[in-house]
């Protein structure tokens, strides 16, 4: 899951070297914290959050396949 978010985010931004994904294991879910450079934040979020929603949808679909609950937070 972590690698999936990283690949998607790196393909969207101008500075792929500044993309970092931190995985936090919770009791019932996995939290993926996506960090990008401030200049690329708009590209990852998109207009009205459409790209962020699309990233979350793709990750959620992959998580369901593995019977897990994953939350993507953009920091």
Curated annotation (Swiss-Prot):
Q: Name one Pfam family in it.
A: KH_KhpA-B
**CDD domains, per database record:** KH-II_YlqC-like
* Ranges of residues in domain KH: 29-75
The UniProt entry's GO CC annotations, sorted and at most eight, read: cytoplasm
Q: Which InterPro entries match?
A: KH_dom-like_a/b, KH_sf_prok-type, KhpA
UniProt GO BP: cell wall organization; peptidoglycan biosynthetic process; regulation of cell shape
Cellular compartments annotated: Cytoplasm
Report a single Gene Ontology molecular function: RNA binding
Residues forming coiled coils = none
In terms of superkingdom, the source organism counts as Bacteria
Which keywords fit this entry according to its UniProt record?
Cell shape, Cell wall biogenesis/degradation, Chaperone, Cytoplasm, RNA-binding
- Report the principal subcellular site: cytoplasm
Instruction: State the Gene3D superfamilies in the record.
Output: 3.30.300.20
What this chain does, per the record?
A probable RNA chaperone. Forms a complex with KhpB which binds to cellular RNA and controls its expression. Plays a role in peptidoglycan (PG) homeostasis and cell length regulation.
Q: How does it assemble?
A: Forms a complex with KhpB.
- Identify its protein family: Belongs to the KhpA RNA-binding protein family.
Q: What is this protein called?
A: RNA-binding protein KhpA
Q: Which gene encodes it?
A: khpA
């Amino acid at each position: 899951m972590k690698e999936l978010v990283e690949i998607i985010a790196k393909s969207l931004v101008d500075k792929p070297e500044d993309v970092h994904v931190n995985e936090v294991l919770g009791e019932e879910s996995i939290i993926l914290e996506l960090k990008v450079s401030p200049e690329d934040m708009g590209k990852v979020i998109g207009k009205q959050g459409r790209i962020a929603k699309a990233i979350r949808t793709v990750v959620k679909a992959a998580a369901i396949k593995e019977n897990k609950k994953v939350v993507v937070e953009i920091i």
